[in-house]
C-alpha cells in the first residue's frame, strides 16, 4: 500500500489579503490545534497553525468524498465554495512573497515524487499555482540518499537552523509522495531590548521550582491590556517587529495562577477582543531570552479534530493519482524558535534603559513565570505561530560577569 508523508518544517527566529472571514476561520482552527496539542504536551509548546493548514490544503487539493469533507469541516470552510480556499491561499502567497528590507520571511513548499509514480498533471499544476511548490523526482528505494536530499533542502530554506531533519528509516519501499513545508522568519524588534540591560532572574516553572534565566528588560510604549474574567487575572502585551507586518502577542497569567486555566479561555473571539481592547501605553517589560526546538506528531491531534479518512487505506485521493491504495501516514512538524534582544541599529525607536528604581506609574509586564504567545501576520490577520513557555532554556549572557549580577 502506497503512503504519503506530510512534513511541515518550520523555523522561527526572533532576532531582534486574506479576507477577514478567512482570517477568523484560520484563527478558530489555530485555537483548536492549540487546545489539542496542549493536552499531550505539558511543558513548552511551539507549533505553526499556518504550516499545518498548508499541508492539509495540499492534500485537500487532491482529496475527494469523505476525505475532502473532513478537511473542509475542520478548517471551517463549510460556508465557502469548494476551491475558493485555494485562491485565498494564492492571494496570501502574493502578499508575503514581496521581499522587504525590514525582515526575512521565506515560505517554501516542495513535493517529492517517486520516480515512475504517476501523479495527475492537474494536481501538479495546482501545487505550483496555489502553493508555489517545487516538484522533484526521487527514488525512495535509496532511503538514505532521499533523506539527505530533502534534509539539505530544509536546511537551506531555514538558513541552516534545522539540520539532519530526516533519516533513512523514515522512508521505505512504499513511500510514493512526500509533501514538505518550510518556513523561515527573522525579524528585528521595532523597539529593541538593550543587551546590557539583560539580567539573570529567577523564573518560576509550572511545578513551582525556579531556574535562573536571562531576562531582557526595557521600557517601551506598546499595546497592553489587563483583563479579569472568570476569577482569572492576566495581562496581554503586543510587541511589533520592524515594518509592522508581524507582531508577537504575549498572554501572562497573574503570578500564582494556573496557566492551564487561562488556556481554557482562549477562543478566536477572545483573541479578537484582546486586539481590539489593548491600548498603547508605556510598559516596563521583563521578557525571557530563550530558544525552543520541538518536533510534534500531528496525526493524533488531527484524529481528535475528526480528520481521520486521509490516514486510512481506503481514502479517496483520486485527485492526486489513480492509485487506489494511497493514504497519508504521517503529519509531522518541527519548529525552531528563538527570541533575544537583537534589533537593528538603525531603528527609529529604542527601548529605554531601566534604572534600579522604577516609577510606580508604569504598567509592569514581568514574564517570570509561564506564559502563552501568538505570532501573527498583520496584513492578513493570520496566526503563524502559537506556543507556551513553561521552562525557558538557560543561556549564557556573553560579555558579562554573571557573578556580579
From Swiss-Prot:
Tissues/organs with expression: Expressed in pancreas and adipose tissues.
Subcellular location: Secreted
Gene Ontology molecular function, alphabetical: serine-type endopeptidase inhibitor activity
Principal cellular location given in the protein's record: secreted
CDD domains according to UniProt: serpinI2_pancpin (cd19576)
Family: Belongs to the serpin family.
Gene: SERPINI2
Signal peptide feature range: 1-18
InterPro entries xref list: Serpin_CS (IPR023795), Serpin_dom (IPR023796), Serpin_fam (IPR000215), Serpin_sf (IPR036186), Serpin_sf_1 (IPR042178), Serpin_sf_2 (IPR042185)
Glycosylation, residue list: 202, 207, 306
Site positions for Reactive bond: 357-358
Gene3D superfamilies attached to this UniProt entry: Alpha-1-antitrypsin, domain 1, Antithrombin, subunit I, domain 2
SMART domains in the record: SERPIN
Keywords: Glycoprotein, Protease inhibitor, Secreted, Serine protease inhibitor, Signal
Organism: Homo sapiens (Human)
Protein name, UniProt field: Serpin I2
Lineage: Eukaryota, Metazoa, Chordata, Craniata, Vertebrata
CC terms in the record's Gene Ontology section: extracellular exosome; extracellular space
Superkingdom: Eukaryota
